[in-house]
Amino acid sequence: MNKSKIRNFSIIAHIDHGKSTLADRILEITQTVSTRELKAQHLDSMDLEQERGITIKLNAVQIKYKDYIFHLIDTPGHVDFTYEVSRSLAASEGALLLVDATQGIEAQTLANAYLALENNLKIIPIINKIDLPSADPERIKGEIEEVIGISAKDTILISAKSGLNVEKVLEEIVDKISYPIDADDDKPLKALVFDSYFDAYRGVILLVRIFEGKIAVNDQFKFISTNKQFHVIELGVRTPTEVKKPFLESGEVGWIAASIRDAKDVSVGDTLTLVKNPTKEALPGYKKVKAVVFTGFYPIDGKDYPVLKESLEKISLSDSSITWELESSKALGFGFRVGFLGMLHMEVLQERLKREFNIDIIATAPSVEYKVYLTNNKVEIVSNPSDLPDRNYIKNIKEPFIRSFILVTEEFIGGIMELCQSKRGVYVNIEYIDKRVKIIYELPLSEIILDFFDKLKSISKGYASFDYEFIEYRDADLVKVDILLNKEKVDAFSFISHRENAYERSKELALKLKDVIPKQSFEIPIQAIIGAKVIARETIKAYRKDVTAKLYGGDVTRRQKLLKKQKEGKKRMKSIGSVEVPQEAFLSVLKSNMDKK
């Protein structure tokens, strides 16, 4: 293969700026997918992606354009999925920077553009949706130069929806993005595993970018970090369906099936090489991603525990950022402590468990990792409130802080600064960019994982965009709040809070639990306590509901239907002592401070 004819590139864009639509137009214009087969968001193969209109998993497709071969590596645009973007960029030589002509540069576009610059990628700026009446391409060009610091002189103005100027984008990819200069088939194999997914018949399928050397069917290869060895059964490229080939060579992006059955054997971001004549060094600059939000996942039916374990293993194959370990709860039995990159990431995984594996789960309140300094000079990392040691043994607790970047129009500055202050934020700076401002605050991570994003969108009428980076751990006055139901402690409802917010959050949670736990044949007190001190209390009055009371006459079948429906509902409850608790009660802990103003 002529290496000078290969172009590997990604698309960088914020949510809703038209990235998946542009990918669809490229597939259509190059006839990679016929117009008849083309559906909107073609590369977004997960149902969830199409419903939410976001890209979650990255996708890689080979495109033939004239006598060139393009490898388009699709990327997500939400802050939670930055790790997917870094993997795409590591496999590319260039990036299309796509900006909405009506919205301008958003915080996540900025973060991903900086990632591309750090990777020394050639960036091609593109302004999309120029056919909209409110489009202002000249202002957006100014933002590209001022905010990102690259020339906007050759910016391409397109409409991905109609296909206007998309052909021009293809020509720019040929002219501006470098071919894989270091590609050399004669060197030892050096390939980056940038993603993986699970196939029921063939095991784990690896997505790889070959940097040097070649790999063929029947070759023995190994992962450099673990030294685990495997045998290539089949390999090929995606167009976007799988096409088998006898070998993959340097510069190419493709897939490898090697009968890998155990999720733990695959390390996304690792370097592959051949067992015979291996490379001496791994590919540089690949950081393992770190989970920042932790929650307990428990099957509603205890019998589903092995199925939940297997499901998490399978999802881990295609999402290496998820961490999970066994944990148990007196209230909920056996489950897992699962780590995520953010709240959207967590919601997506819950949806996938339900859709792909048909498992209903209870999720406990999300938490972050705290550093707990003990009186015996030991340090413990705690992400589960139940694991927090007794107050008498704690010297101090530190919590993670982040630096947040909020891009918004000037009229919303006051409301957003007020929101940041209410979240214990520390003001850093405000930068004015044309008609918009970049507000920089340092915030405790625990304050943004629940409702910060929703409130930000609400205050700014949907116009604010948000990105953040971890900075350090800082001292904090934190307390553990326990919830008692009918005088029994429910460990799944415990949470860690800043002392000044503990009362308000406890009061709100007690009210929510009162709302969602059905009345039963005895009175149920709900109490929030710190140590032995009760800080909030609500009471559920006794009541027994007869679901068939509203029927008259002898309508036996209708009566049986209602009783069956009630029985099904009870299946979805957990007994805590003598109290039946519905799944919604656990979800209300998740959302316990969503509606605070």
From Swiss-Prot:
Lineage: superkingdom: Bacteria
Reaction(s) catalyzed by this protein? GTP + H2O = GDP + phosphate + H(+)
Q: What is its EC number?
A: 3.6.5.n1
Keyword Nucleus among record annotations? no
Enumerate the subcellular locations listed in this protein's record, separating them with semicolons.
Answer: Cell membrane
How does this protein sit in the membrane? Peripheral membrane protein
A single Gene Ontology molecular function, please? ribosome binding
Keyword annotations from UniProtKB, A to Z:
Cell membrane, GTP-binding, Hydrolase, Membrane, Nucleotide-binding, Protein biosynthesis
Q: Which residues form the tr-type G domain?
A: 4-181
Signal sequence span is: none
Q: Which Pfam families match?
A: EFG_C (PF00679), GTP_EFTU (PF00009), LepA_C (PF06421)
The protein's matches in Gene3D superfamilies, at most eight in alphabetical order, are given as: 3.30.70.240, Elongation factor 4, C-terminal domain, Elongation Factor G (Translational Gtpase), domain 3, P-loop containing nucleotide triphosphate hydrolases, Translation factors
> What HAMAP family does the database record attribute to this sequence?
LepA (MF_00071)
Q: What is this protein called?
A: Elongation factor 4
Native organism is Mycoplasmopsis pulmonis (strain UAB CTIP)
* Organism ancestry: Bacteria, Bacillati, Mycoplasmatota, Mycoplasmoidales, Metamycoplasmataceae
